[in-house]
Every structure is written in structure tokens, then in C-alpha cells.
Amino acid sequence: MPGGVKEMRCDLAVIGAGIAGLSAALFAANRGIETALVGETGEILFASGLMDLLSVHPLEEGKTWDDPWAALTALRRDIPDHPYARMPAADIAAAFDALLAFLKNQGLPYRRRPDRNVEVPVAMGAVKRTYCVPETVWNGVRALEEKQPCLIVDFDQLRGFSARQIASTLEPRWPGLRTARLPFPGGTFSQQYAEQLAMALEAPRNRASLACDIRACLGAARSVGLPAVLGLYRVQMIFEDLQKRVGVPLFEIPILPPSVAGLRLRDAFHREIGRAHV
């Protein structure tokens, strides 16, 4: 074609390469539909790793819902042209099932309560209501619900994540949180980036060193929250190994973007998109 533009023919073109676009492309390809994906996947790096269904409706009132399916019923009644209103609840549930099955197969298992939203602490000490969370975050859901004695850990020079700020902001809802700032094993950086930390924890010696430092300040804590940097490629293995070394449940706290959670999702989708020939 003129100008060297290559013509491509397909049954379906998906425009947009965020989580929705990537999921749609995979759903289609897995059903034998010849699919092309148009877009840059950079936006997925801004993902927290949390998967929402519906927790606030109407937005202008800021009404929150424990039951996302009841919220969907209200949304369909109030906004009949909304995309959610055009899909049966069973199809939405099946889409979530398919997405979570795919992520589990990619080594990124998720947890949820099928008929309830959950609350999870996130960066800066906010609490987010969501539907599905990574397995590495789930212990934080339980710790917040039970108001467990908990230690929040941050690292020298890691920007955008302060254990003290998180504990201070959560104090009215979760009193008695303790904090610790630790040096990160595996190298000295003038400024630490989340991806560097996640890669460093691929090495067993770094996990052993970090676990030793955490145990030294554990005290009476029954759980430990850390920034979501516990591995990039072997997330579940690294998380379980570090948790075993520390001796109490750990949980990741989603960090500000660009995030390791976004990198994990991007890599998982890229692997599967390549396999599916999208």
C-alpha cells in the first residue's frame, strides 16, 4: 500500500490496550475469532492490580455498596443505556471467571467473595472498596477486617510509599498500627524504583536478608504489610517463601503508578496474546 502501510484483515479489531481491551482480545481469540489489537499497553502500568465490579452508585451521591450485584441492579434501573445494563449478570460473572482463571494460569491468582466487595488498604493510607484482589493482597483484607496488630514496612528511598503516612491515615479505622523503615537488600540506590526492588527479590539471599530484618522488628504483630514489590515473574513463589521466612501472614499494599502490579499484568497478557496469535 502507499507509504508502506501494511493492510491487515481480521474478524475483530479491538481498540485500546488497557485491561478491558486486552481481556476482550483474549476472550475473542480463545473463541476462534481472528483478532487484532490496536493500542499501546503502557496504560496498564497504571493499574493497581485490583479488579473492580461496582462499588459506588450513584457517583454524584457517593453511595457505596457491599453487594456489587445489588449495585448493578440499581445501575440498570437508573441508567438503562449503561454498558453494564446491556449484559446479563451471568455474562458479567462468566467474564470475571474467565479473567481470573487466565491470571491464575499465568501465576497471578486472585481472591474474592463472590457476592461482596472487600476493602483493602492502598498507598497513602486510603481504603479502596473492590471486588477481586491478588492473592498477595488478600491477607490485608482480613487484617483490616479483624483490626489485627500489624506492622507496616517501607524502604529507604522508595518514593511514594510511606508506612508512617499509611498508619496515620488509617488510625481512626485501624488503631495501633506500627511502622518500620528498612534498608532494602541487594544493592544501594540513591533512589529506589519499585521494579528494581521486585527484581532484587528474585534472589533467595535478598529474601532471607529482608525476612531477617522484618523479624527483628516484628514484635507482637500478627501480620505485615509491605509495598507491592514482592517479585515480578515468580510472584506467588516469592511471596510464599518470604512469608514462610517471616513467620506471620504478609500482604502487599498497592503502590502509586507506574506499579509492579501493572508490570505483572502486562507481562501476563503479552505472553497469552502471543500464544493466541492476536
Label every model-predicted segment:
Residues M1-L12, N30, E43, P58-E60, ...:
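Extreme N-terminal leader/targeting segments of oxidoreductases
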Residues C10-L37:
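N-terminal Rossmann-like FAD-binding beta1-loop-alpha1 element of flavoenzymes
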Residues A25-A28, L53, I152, I273:
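Hydrophobic structural packing positions in well-ordered secondary structure
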Residues F27, D91-A94, A98-A101, Q165, ...:
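Alpha-helical scaffold segments in soluble metabolic enzymes
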Residues I33, D97-L108, K244-V248, G274:
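Generic secondary-structure signature for well-ordered alpha-helical cores
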Residues G39-R76, G186-M199:
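Conserved N-terminal glycine-rich FAD pyrophosphate-binding loop of Rossmann-like flavoproteins
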Residues T41-F46, V127-H277:
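Predominantly flavin-linked oxidoreductase catalytic cores and closely associated redox partners
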Residues L53-A143, Q148-F155, I166-P172:
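Dinucleotide-binding Rossmann-like beta1-alpha1 core, especially the glycine-rich loop
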